[in-house]
Amino acid sequence: MGTTKMVSLLNHSLNVTTKDGRTFVGQLLAFDGFMNLVLSDCQEYRHIKKQNVPSNSVYEEKRMLGLVILRGEFIVSLSVQGPPPMDPSMRGSLLSGPGVARPAGRGIPLGQAPVGLAGPVRGVGYTAPPPPAGFGRGAPPPGFRPV
């Protein structure tokens, strides 16, 4: 698929089949040149055959995965399952709930650090010792004789 076609599929609900037979259904958030896909609200469907039963009984196992990155190397087919959700500006207004968005207070005033994390108090204790003396600037190390 060309990138123009893939760009038109952004936010659509896709049905992606992989080499091992699994099917992933989710909303396309992103893709790259290697055909790696990022799907949100993804569900995985697997067809499982029962080993002990002689008849060809196959059942489908479904599990909710959430946000998934599918490697393009393993993708066999890609089909559109549904259109993108309604306008993003309307979608945000529908999801808001009661209350006011503000950070949760943790009981610590903003201007102060906790007691153990405050650091040393000025004027208490000794100063730091001086750094160790070096060899001097530009002088060769001991035992080295310039030519």
UniProtKB/Swiss-Prot annotation:
SMART domains: Sm. Belongs to the 40S cdc5-associated complex (or cwf complex), a spliceosome sub-complex reminiscent of a late-stage spliceosome composed of the U2, U5 and U6 snRNAs and at least brr2, cdc5, cwf2/prp3, cwf3/syf1, cwf4/syf3, cwf5/ecm2, spp42/cwf6, cwf7/spf27, cwf8, cwf9, cwf10, cwf11, cwf12, prp45/cwf13, cwf14, cwf15, cwf16, cwf17, cwf18, cwf19, cwf20, cwf21, cwf22, cwf23, cwf24, cwf25, cwf26, cyp7/cwf27, cwf28, cwf29/ist3, lea1, msl1, prp5/cwf1, prp10, prp12/sap130, prp17, prp22, sap61, sap62, sap114, sap145, slu7, smb1, smd1, smd3, smf1, smg1 and syf2. This is Small nuclear ribonucleoprotein-associated protein B. It is found in: Nucleus; Cytoplasm. PROSITE patterns: SM. Residues 1-84 form the Sm domain. GO terms for biological process: mRNA 5'-splice site recognition; mRNA cis splicing, via spliceosome; mRNA splicing, via spliceosome. One of its GO terms (molecular function) is RNA binding. InterPro entries: LSM_dom_sf (IPR010920), Sm (IPR047575), Sm_dom_euk/arc (IPR001163), snRNP_SmB/NAA38-like (IPR050914). GO terms for cellular component: catalytic step 2 spliceosome; cytoplasm; cytosol; nucleus; post-mRNA release spliceosomal complex; spliceosomal complex; U1 snRNP; U2 snRNP. The gene is smb1.
